[in-house]
From Swiss-Prot:
Keyword Nucleotide-binding listed: yes
Task of the protein: An essential GTPase that binds both GDP and GTP, with rapid nucleotide exchange. Plays a role in 16S rRNA processing and 30S ribosomal subunit biogenesis and possibly also in cell cycle regulation and energy metabolism.
Gene (UniProt): era
Protein name (record): GTPase Era
Domain Era-type G: 7-174
Superkingdom classification of source: Bacteria
Species this chain originates from: Bordetella avium (strain 197N)
Amino acid sequence: MSSQAFRTGFVAIVGRPNVGKSTLTNALIGSKISIVSRKAQTTRHRIHGVLTREHEQFVFVDTPGFQTRHGGAMNRMMNRVVTQALADVDVVVHVVEAGKWSEGDAKLLPLLPKAERTILAISKIDALKSRDELFPFVAKIMAQHAYGAVVPVSATKNHQLDQLLEEIAQRLPEGEPMFEEDTLTDRSMRFIAAELVREKIFRLVGDELPYGCTVVIEQWEETDAHARIAACVVVERDSHRPILLGAGGQHMKRIATEARQDIAKLLDKPVHLEVYIKVRKGWSDREGALRDLGYE
């Protein structure tokens, strides 16, 4: 029996929008618990993903991108989620896209904890034309904030993810595991299903449809043999409905089909998925409406 102490703790994955936080979280855990698209603001909730190894349990908190535009209830809510996560965790991984430092990255620096608890992860390094660009880019960031470690990674190529996990593990406190060994997330299947529908919407019509769109699971009936799910897509304007439907309803059919396939894979059983649309004007700019729709 190993005498090595078990370590467990919460790890926040933070950064400005669209730097690859959810892709990195999914790659570290080895399962899709956070939705991914090329659009900013895809992640709106804190999502806990769990990875258990022989001597460690990592509880990852995938946060929304930190917003530098102010004034909207949705942006205020997402920034509260980020700042709360930073206060509640044991280790912070600050994700910065390789070669693309911006004001949004800099705005997070004053919120980061002490250097020994913070790791700089340079994401998407496979997109760099030359690795010679990496050192001056990292030096520029380190001149503005001290980090306990710097790890260049590529989540899509599985590059240096083990090294990042080792750096995180060194900083976790000793303690008993918080979740069963086979747990992947503390989010419900209903929540993950709604997120998967929202992912398909962002991927298919994200360029045309503004961010006033969310998904609520209104029916969930599950047996050992199959599941029947009804998902309501809530939009802010009547003009959003035809964008979602597409010509002859083709967009909605594709969204439902692709989401159903992912949910069936997750549940490991056949799924009947019904997706329909409701208009709720101005919901994304009213904090009461955000709470009603399940936002923190």
